[in-house]
């Protein structure tokens, strides 16, 4: 079988790929693939691995031998699943590989925002501590998390992991009902109510029609003035212009964003302005520990092996209409 990797550079240069390479006899490895290159590169492929390269209907139509697409990520919005089904192609995604790393990163953002770590570090580097008449600086308000309420939207393994750490800090945890769902389970609260209750709101839901723009201007206005918002889920869930305005106006207390609507943000982004207080933007790196990336590669290798053995796993679309 002939395999094609479309964006190997997105996995980093420091991984052990021996087991993955051993799954197929012939590979074409591409560090990056531009949209106009995709169809030609997969024309002879039986198996394609993509992280973020888009496979649309034209790409599937151009690949008559294609049997399996392995998405080297959890999100699958770069794959036309209907086209995959139409062409009898099985699509598998990867899950769970980054959970410890994303949970760690999420809570690192929460702690940094609550303690105003970037602001105090900048003040020290600017010499403000050296010039202080006292032994400390107290220029920025520090929030103690114990007793505060963590609101979670998206309560899969990531949301549950962050909630577990929050409880260890003495926080109360409240979980939103699934956006777009009818009815609210007894152990959940409506998103609208959670916005008003949460001192820290953390997002771990997928980007769907129900969650696109979920946190917009009206939702930010419902949040507490000192509330913190953290998004390590997907860009597009938060209205970035509205968030920038809310932070400048002091409508909420701070925000940590590991994802943006366009990545990388080549055309600029409202959240990249340098006048926004208590905002931390990280470059979609929450998932990026070596351990997480190696687990991802091993999982993709498993998917290929399982497919060849006739028992594909983590199937999100298949010729049987999955």
Please describe what each predicted stretch is.
Residues 72-73, 89-100, 177, 233:
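Short beta->alpha connector loops at strand-helix junctions that form conserved
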Residues 91, 226, 232-322:
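Rossmann-like dinucleotide-binding domain for NAD(H)/NADP(H)
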């Amino acid at each position: 079988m002939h395999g094609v990797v479309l964006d190997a550079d997105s996995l980093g240069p420091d991984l052990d790929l021996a087991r993955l390479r051993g799954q197929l006899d012939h590979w074409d490895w591409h560090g990056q693939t531009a949209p106009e290159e995709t169809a030609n590169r997969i024309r002879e492929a039986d198996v394609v691995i993509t992280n973020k390269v888009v496979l649309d209907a034209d790409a599937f139509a151009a690949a008559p031998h294609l049997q399996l697409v392995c998405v080297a990520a959890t999100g699958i919005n770069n794959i036309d699943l209907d086209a995959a089904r139409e062409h009898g192609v099985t699509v598998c995604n990867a899950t769970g590989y980054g959970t410890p790393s994303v949970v760690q990163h999420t809570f690192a953002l929460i702690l940094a925002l609550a303690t105003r770590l970037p602001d105090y570090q900048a003040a020290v580097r600017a010499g403000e501590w050296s010039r202080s008449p006292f032994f400390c600086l107290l220029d920025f308000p520090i929030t103690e998390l114990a007793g505060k309420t963590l609101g979670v939207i998206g309560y899969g393994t990531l949301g549950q992991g962050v909630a577990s750490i929050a409880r260890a800090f003495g926080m109360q945890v409240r979980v939103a009902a699934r956006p777009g769902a009818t009815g609210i389970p007894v152990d959940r609260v409506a998103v609208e109510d959670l916005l008003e209750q949460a001192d820290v709101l953390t997002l771990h839901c997928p980007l769907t029609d129900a969650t696109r723009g979920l946190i917009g201007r009206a939702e930010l206005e419902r949040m507490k003035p000192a509330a913190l918002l953290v998004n390590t889920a997907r860009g597009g869930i938060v209205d970035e212009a509205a968030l920038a305005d809310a932070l400048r106006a002091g409508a909420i207390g701070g925000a940590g964003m590991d994802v943006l609507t366009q990545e990388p943000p080549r055309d600029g982004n409202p959240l990249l302005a340098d006048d926004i207080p208590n905002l931390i933007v990280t470059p979609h790196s929450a998932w990026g520990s070596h351990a997480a990336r190696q687990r991802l590669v091993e999982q993709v290798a498993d998917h290929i092996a399982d497919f060849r053995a006739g028992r594909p796993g983590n199937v999100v679309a298949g010729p049987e209409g999955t």
